Amino acid sequence: MGAVDTSERLSKLRQLMQQHKVDVYIVPSEDSHQSEYIAPCDARREFISGFSGSAGTAIISLSKAALSTDGRYFNQAAKQLDNNWQLLKGGVEGVPTWQEWTTEEAQGGKAVGVDPSLITASGARKLAETLKKNGSSLVGVRENLVDLVWGKERPARPSEKVRVHPEKYAGKTFQEKVAELRKELESKKKAGFVISMLDEIAWLFNLRGTDIPYNPVFFSYAVITPTTAEIYVEDDKLTPEVKAHLGQDVVVKPYESIFADAQALSTKSQSAGENAAKFLLSNKASWALSLSLGGEGQVEEARSPVADAKAIKNETELEGMRACHIRDGAALTEYFAWLENELINKKTVLDEVDGADKLEQIRSKHDLFAGLSFDTISSTGPNGAVIHYKPEKGSCAIIDPSAIYLCDSGCQYFDGTTDTTRTFHFGVPTEFEKRAFTLVLKGTIGIDMAVFPKGTSGFAIDVLARQHLWREGLDFLHGTGHGVGSYLNVHEGPIGIGTRVQYTEVPIAAGNVISDEPGYYEDGKFGIRIENIVMAREVKTAHNFGDKQWLGFEHVTMTPIGRNLIEPSLLSDAELKWVNDYHAEIWAKTEHFFREDNLTRSWLERETQPISK
């Protein structure tokens, strides 16, 4: 995870910038579908900067370079950026945003360039307006300059086959989903919807792919109108089964033809006059796609109705999430029992990658296994403080049994997606480690036990996860929760729990699946995080003020919480009962996996025993 010398790459990029008459060049993290996680061929920001985190923006002027990222990645970026780069710590008071840094560098009528397919239309407009006030301009550079620097070394675009996601896991046919989308478009008087987000297309058509590691999606676009459904994907990626699945209901078109077709739709709309219905475009769609559709005057940009529908799981999907978390919980239990035995009893020397590999091996034995949902974060001691740490063979640490061990991992199963973090100490934790862990646990329980009226946002309940840390002057620099897909992306919008303004926009609704993951981190020492997946459900309350609908959470993660890190005296009676009830539930739902595995069964029995003050 060390720094890469980027001097030559930056030199070549600056030569290209001068050729294209660009003074500042922006390199976003995202691909042309604004994906958070990307295929290797789209890792442009990582290539040019050396920083491999999933979030961040690189900005290069003719004399400087800066990388902006959020609190999850401050430590990682500090280690991976060489001395050509300035780290902009997002959200830290007094540190400029990447937009502010760009504006400052572009003073005096300079041109700022960006690949228009890698930035949202709304983001481009806001930046252009800011630059205009400064006498500068934003220029769309269609030929990606980083790709030119990368050259033949750039990985090829994936060409794996697309496959059908059966109704027995999806819970609805794609025809039903398209019909519901059309009703919404009709109610909004829209001519159609152009879809660019990969997980939305996969969900809508009940299809899955492997184009992006850990995310079962495939490169595609789609256009839905009142009478037609078109999907833009390379024909050689479609198996006979997929073609039969789509049948006569969907027209398949070449992936690259979306922009020409979008221009044709724009021309047709303009010829129909001012009163013609507009096309709907997601507010996360690219500037390039928006321009092809005629820009702001020809389209309405809004939150995607498909994203909203996808986030509210049906009963089949919810049951799948329950089932896959029981299997996954059993796999994690087997792993932690194995790891403790190897470290403590056998005195085996294991590094962090050894641990991650063993966990994947155990998971792969379970029914409906379809791969991991992200790189396993297997971290010992100080590496646990690197929130999105990625261990690599040869440079990772040996797991220290006398230090805290944090493991954040997830899996894709055909019936659901998992994401679980557990923190263990296989030796004797310090009093402060126990105190910090218990404060984090109280936050986890606070979210889990929350009851709130319909219409409440994730922003509003975030304090329940942080309040106990705040009382002692502690905090964590990441969100408390993110949406989770159903055999889809492990990070799914539009809902979440956290301090970001975006979490005020969409209220939590019954059927949402969200992570509950407060943490605490001490740089250079340790990291603590406890992550469960919870499902928002309607709950019955003793009273019903205002005739409101009330919601609460049902946890589905079935993995024990490290008992020797819990300080029972810090827990209320209700919290203590929650821990004991939770561990009893885990035992009841997973012990049958280990009736012929005495090692794991004994570990599970020990870790799920009641605790008391």
From Swiss-Prot:
GO molecular function: metal ion binding; metalloaminopeptidase activity
Enzyme class: hydrolase
Organism encoding this protein: Penicillium rubens (strain ATCC 28089 / DSM 1075 / NRRL 1951 / Wisconsin 54-1255)
A single Gene Ontology CC term: cytoplasm
EC number of the protein: 3.4.11.9
Name recorded for this polypeptide: Probable Xaa-Pro aminopeptidase P
Gene Ontology terms: biological process: proteolysis
Cofactor binding, per record: Binds 2 manganese ions per subunit.
Catalytic activity: Release of any N-terminal amino acid, including proline, that is linked to proline, even from a dipeptide or tripeptide
Protein family per UniProt: Belongs to the peptidase M24B family.
Alphabetized UniProt keyword annotations: Aminopeptidase, Hydrolase, Manganese, Metal-binding, Metalloprotease, Protease
Pfam families from the UniProt entry: Creatinase_N (PF01321), Creatinase_N_2 (PF16189), Peptidase_M24 (PF00557), Peptidase_M24_C (PF16188)
Function: Catalyzes the removal of a penultimate prolyl residue from the N-termini of peptides.
Residues given in the record as Mn(2+) 1 binding sites: D419, E517, E531
Residues involved in Mn(2+) 2 binding: D408, D419, E531
Cofactor(s) the protein requires to work: Mn(2+)
